[in-house]
Design a protein with these regions (language model features):
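N-terminal Rossmann-like dinucleotide-binding module
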Residues: 1-39
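N-terminal glycine-/serine-/threonine-rich beta1-alpha1-beta2 phosphate-ribose binding loop
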Residues: 36-78
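Conserved beta-strand segments of alpha/beta enzyme cores
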Residues: 25, 56-58, 102
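Donor/substrate-binding cores of folate-linked one-carbon enzymes
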Residues: 22, 32, 81-201, 206
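An anion-binding loop in the catalytic cleft
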Residues: 214-314
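Acyl-group handling in specialized metabolite and lipid biosynthesis
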Residues: 203-216
Length: 314
């Protein structure tokens, strides 16, 4: 079988490694072009490119996969199947229709829930008790193709976007290896998705999503803190500086103070009034500083009851 693998970030590394470890010969890996990174603007390969080179797999890095020259190059490889995991570009119909087994996608949610670019973070932010991975047949819609297989992964109470990312990457790798034989021998079943998803589209995460709105319920903010760890992180402003919040908890009481007001600041944490209940900050990072527990932070930063967290630097 001629397998082509398309993927870019860390999430797509484990499935590629699993293919190699289980004896599947990958004809080529397609990933995004190298990008400049850091102060020196050094060109850095994608995580998937690095993994492919470890296994001696040829790597193609088209700027746009819909480019006719690239489509022709791919056609000449005569793939039997194309496996896609977080590639980062919309794949045109000319490629979707190319392999005899079509294109399959490893999606990090239990479809039809959480279609879109950020299903992992959104599951944590929404307080889901479980998530998982779906392998689906790709069509022209966004994550709407027929479902071939799924695996359920429960969420821990302290689950973060990062920890769930790692769990689902590994689950996706295992599910892929389990699913491929049935695709190749024709025994795989396919289940159509309903037209409507029971959850909103999980759009790409932006930095501004991390701004803590203390007029909301503290429980929603605590989930936001976990969902956006490690990137882009939840944050607020204090005295004109950004304060990232890495760990928090909910205090089951209703504050009388205005949302955003510091109620208490001691070794037990920084208590902040919210629209409902109280958010306690346990690990923070002041602009230009390292992340630290609030006890250590308070030894170097004077914060007292009545101080206010703001939604801007002003």
């Amino acid at each position: 079988m001629k397998i082509i693998y398309m993927g870019t970030p860390d999430f797509a590394v484990a499935p590629l490694a699993a293919l190699a470890e289980n004896g599947y010969e990958v004809e080529a890996v397609i990933t995004q072009p190298d990008k400049p990174k850091g102060r020196g603007k050094t060109m850095m390969p994608t995580p998937v490119k690095e993994e492919a080179l470890k296994h001696g797999i040829p790597v193609l890095q088209p700027v746009k996969v819909r480019n006719p020259e690239f489509v022709e190059e791919l056609k000449n490889l005569a793939p039997d199947i194309i496996i896609v995991a977080a590639f980062g570009q919309i794949i045109p119909k000319s490629i979707l229709d190319m392999p005899r087994f079509g294109c399959i996608n490893i999606h990090a949610s239990l479809l039809p829930k959480y279609r879109g670019a950020a299903p992992i973070q959104q599951a944590v932010i929404d307080g889901e008790k479980e998530s998982g991975v779906t392998i689906m047949q790709m069509g022209t819609g966004l994550d709407t193709g027929d479902m071939i297989s799924r695996i359920v992964v429960p969420l821990a109470k302290d689950e973060t976007g990062g920890s769930l990312f790692d769990k689902l990457a590994q689950a996706g790798a295992e599910l892929l290896v389990q699913t491929l034989p049935s695709i190749f021998d024709g025994t795989a079943t396919r289940e159509k998705q309903p037209e409507e998803s029971p959850t909103p589209y999980a759009a790409m995460i932006s930095k501004k999503m991390g701004l803590l709105d203390f007029s909301k319920n503290a429980e929603a903010l605590e989930r936001l803190v976990r969902g956006l760890d490690p990137w882009p992180s939840a944050f607020t402003f204090i005295n004109g500086k950004t304060l990232k919040v890495w760990k928090s908890s909910v205090l089951e009481k209703q504050a009388q103070e205005a949302p955003g007001t510091v109620i208490a600041a001691d070794k037990g944490g920084i208590q902040v009034a919210c629209g409902q209940k109280v958010l306690v900050l346990h690990e923070v990072q002041l602009e230009g500083k390292k992340r630290m527990e609030t006890d250590a932070f308070l030894r170097g930063y004077q914060l007292k009851p009545g101080d206010m967290f703001r939604d801007s630097r002003e």
